[in-house]
Amino acid sequence: MSPIPAKVTAIEKRGLQYQVVVEIVPKYRGSFNTIVFGEFKPHSGSLKDGRLNLVYYQNPGLNIGDPFPLWTLH
């Protein structure tokens, strides 16, 4: 596995969910399915244009600007 540099750019609580936006390196060409999450595993998410949009049902304990641990299977 190879690390992917990433950081949290936005967090918003919507009802019972937490929407988290994570910015990754723009040159990442893999799909969402090739990303491996560390301890902050989301319920669901998507990847578009170097942005991960993630949904959590519990507070992930993240703050804007925090590094976000990610790896790729490739």
Located regions from the model:
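Short coil-to-beta-strand transition motifs
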Residues: 1-7
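Short coil-to-beta transition motif at edge beta-strands of beta-rich domains
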Residues: 65-68
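Short, charged beta-turn/beta-strand-edge "cap" motif at the junction between a beta-strand
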Residues: 58-60, 71-74
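Residue-level recognition of beta-strand microenvironments
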Residues: 11-13, 27
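Short, exposed beta-strand/loop patches in secreted or surface proteins that constitute
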Residues: 9-11, 42-46, 71
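Acidic, low-complexity, intrinsically disordered interaction modules
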Residues: 21, 26-62
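Short aromatic-glycine-enriched beta-strand elements
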Residues: 15-21
